[in-house]
Amino acid sequence: MSITDVLSADDIAAALQECQDPDTFEPQKFFQTSGLSKMSASQVKDVFRFIDNDQSGYLDEEELKFFLQKFESGARELTESETKSLMAAADNDGDGKIGAEEFQEMVHS
């Protein structure tokens, strides 16, 4: 699966443009611009599986650091503060990782 199988390349490019500078990543803005927030719950979970590098069923801080690169290989890494902020926004049960359900809830919040 390629991310452009489910999201428009133009929308992804626009979303990445908005957060190309360090410490400018805003999850909700990214989800809206990229089109993720308009997708069904099952489509968002498909994207989650694409982002989940080790297929563990969870995203940890190391995977989140490379979040933008899953949408475009040349994109920057998230800063430590952006990574921690993204984790805090989605990790509802406080276990230090984001499950598919938590990811979907964050995208649609």
From Swiss-Prot:
Ca(2+) 2 binds at D91, D93, D95, K97, E102. GO terms for cellular component: cytoplasm. Disulfide bonds: none annotated. Keywords: Calcium, Metal-binding, Repeat. Gene3D superfamilies: EF-hand (1.10.238.10). One of its GO terms (molecular function) is calcium ion binding. Ca(2+) 1 binds at D52, D54, S56, Y58, E63. Belongs to the parvalbumin family. This is Oncomodulin-2. It comes from Homo sapiens.
